[in-house]
Amino acid sequence: MEAAVRRECLAVRNTAGIFDASTLGKIEVVGPDAATFMNRMYVNAWTKLGVGRCRYGLLCRENGFVYDDGVVGRIAEDRFHVTTTTGGAAGVLSMMEDYLQTEWPDLDVWLTSTTEQWSVIALQGPKAREILAPLVDGLDISGEVLPHMSVVEGTILGVPMRLFRVSFSGELGFEINVPTTEGRRIWEAVWQAGQAHGLTPYGTETMHVLRAEKGYIIVGQETDGTVTPDDAGCGWAVGKAKKDFVGKRSLALPALQSPERMQLVGLLTDAPQEVLEEGAQLVADPKEAIPMRKLGYVTSSYFSATLGRSIALGMISGGRARKGQTLYVPMEDRVIPVKLVDPVFYDAEGVRLND
């Protein structure tokens, strides 16, 4: 499997890859007060998001800890297409309904699960636009008309479509949403169109590596129910000027603002071929008597074919201030030195996904 993952990763980085993202949760938030509702639910600001634009949405519980995330597209002034994590779809909808019915019954909003109504085909890589352009019906998908984090409605081979210009790989990317009944036909059409461009199907393991190279978190892997947006490196997403949102008061607590909290960092081993074990603990002094003081742990660890070496993400106490330091992973038969670095290993400026 390792050889397949490396092959698929390089294909996405160099040509194009196709991935079935249909399992992602989808919720339609509709009504005159849809933007107000989103503004109260998510940590982000939504009222000024333009129609046809997308935003990375981060949802917290009342305690201020990250509960779910996903890209949200504004389809119309009164309609949002919300994506959730695969496992979080039912919980997010339940949470939304709970707040709508008990806290804000005055809001004129309807919520509908559309997870099973849409098939989602992710087309990622530098050749993605060349493959997709001949298939969409009279739609300009150039970077000038459809920039990164945009959404447009149209048709693909006569089939109704919501096309998102988004990327979880760090490359130029599109997510083609079509009715589930047409999903296989459109997949096969995209697949055939991509043969001349080296299109390669890729799976979940490859997706995990690609997103880790970009430092993108996965809820439930980088988060464990005790992680705030800032801990996860997503403090930029929090709407600082918003009067209120779920979790706002908790995020203001001193305990949740401590500089010693576990924070997301990148991890590099001295030996580029050594892949850390996920869950491995990191300490400052491997010679300290047991029980050693744990400073953090590895959340994600992979070999990056793109970079030609191993990479890892971890949550470390005061991690951002420790960048450049060396910590240690005590193993049964050896001690592994690990350098703390920025969690974005690939294209930190975002040039490729904005192509």
Language-model features and meaning:
Residues M1-G57, F65:
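Acidic, proline/glycine-enriched N-terminal capping motif
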Residues E8-V12, N63-V66, G70, T102, ...:
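Membrane-targeting and insertion segments and their boundary/processing signals
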Residues D20, D69, E175:
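Acidic active-site catalytic centers that drive phospho-/nucleotidyl reactions
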Residues A76-D355:
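Conserved, structured C-terminal
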Residues A45-D78, T83-Y99:
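Well-ordered mid-protein domain cores that form the structural environment of catalytic cofactors
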Residues G25, G57, G70-V71, V152, ...:
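Residue-level detector of beta-strand structural context in well-folded domains
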